Amino acid sequence: MGKWEGTGNQTLGLVSQSGRFRLRWQTRPEPGHDAAGGRFKLTVHSGVSGRPLQEVTDQRGPGEGAYNVEDDPRPFNLMVYSEGLVWTIVADEVVMARPATR
């Protein structure tokens, strides 16, 4: 679905055909900033109405994590709020497999 890297606040758009996707993120200190400082907040918003749907993380300092989003198929916006950190976000569509029937 997508991969983004950056610093500071950004709005990232994506479209999920299933409404199910996994977000993975990693943050590290920006050059010249305190290695233990910084803040990273990631929320998922509707790309249609703009309303917030889910808060993914609100972390202090560098780190990483993953979060599964389950919603209706639609456009989404990822809202990034970041201070003092370089971030990378990867979004992958989740495909649900069903056992074969005989």
Go through each PLM region and give its residues.
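Acidic, Ser/Thr/Pro
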Residues: 1-102
